[in-house]
Amino acid sequence: MSQGLPAAGSVLQRSVAAPGNQPQPQPQQQSPEDDDRKVRRREKNRVAAQRSRKKQTQKADKLHEEYESLEQENTMLRREIGKLTEELKHLTEALKEHEKMCPLLLCPMNFVPVPPRPDPVAGCLPR
């Protein structure tokens, strides 16, 4: 006889199940207490899942509100930066005009070399 082959009179029986079609164990008789416990567990699980989904939704809503608030604040701050930049430009121009005709700066007795100033606008603008 060759190895691995069944004897002539024996019959091999295999249960062939399609993939995904695992044979399901037959449910045993459950007592009413088991049924009640199962129903209570499912109800408790359902309530917990509902609570979790509600909490997740509330968290997302809160994050969205915070996002909107920060966007508004950001817009206000950008407007303020624009206004302050314009004010700085006007004041710088006024100072330059004043320096041209200021008698204290034009007096030869008060001749003090004034070092050139860096552009104040460039240092204030966001990069």
Curated annotation (Swiss-Prot):
Region (Basic motif) location: 37-62
Keyword Nucleotide-binding (UniProt): no
Complex and partners: Heterodimer; heterodimerizes with JUN family proteins. Interacts with JUN.
Top-level taxonomy: Eukaryota, Metazoa, Chordata, Craniata, Vertebrata
Listed GO MF terms: DNA-binding transcription factor activity; DNA-binding transcription factor activity, RNA polymerase II-specific; DNA-binding transcription repressor activity, RNA polymerase II-specific; RNA polymerase II cis-regulatory region sequence-specific DNA binding; sequence-specific double-stranded DNA binding
Record domain bZIP: where: 35-98
Basic and acidic residues: compositionally biased ranges: 58-67
Job of this protein: AP-1 family transcription factor that controls the differentiation of CD8(+) thymic conventional dendritic cells in the immune system. Required for development of CD8-alpha(+) classical dendritic cells (cDCs) and related CD103(+) dendritic cells that cross-present antigens to CD8 T-cells and produce interleukin-12 (IL12) in response to pathogens. Acts via the formation of a heterodimer with JUN family proteins that recognizes and binds DNA sequence 5'-TGA[CG]TCA-3' and regulates expression of target genes.
Gene Ontology biological process terms from the UniProt entry: dendritic cell differentiation; integrated stress response signaling; myeloid dendritic cell differentiation; negative regulation of transcription by RNA polymerase II; regulation of transcription by RNA polymerase II; response to virus
GO cellular component: chromatin; cytosol; nucleolus; nucleoplasm; nucleus; RNA polymerase II transcription regulator complex
Organism, as annotated: Homo sapiens
Residue ranges of the region described as Leucine-zipper: 63-91
Alphabetical keyword list: Activator, DNA-binding, Nucleus, Phosphoprotein, Repressor, Transcription, Transcription regulation
SUPFAM superfamilies for the chain: Leucine zipper domain
Location of this chain's protein in the cell: Nucleus
Region (Disordered): 1-72
PROSITE patterns on file: BZIP, BZIP_BASIC
Family designation: Belongs to the bZIP family.
Protein's recorded name: Basic leucine zipper transcriptional factor ATF-like 3
Modified residues (Phosphoserine): S2, S31
Pfam families xref list: bZIP_1
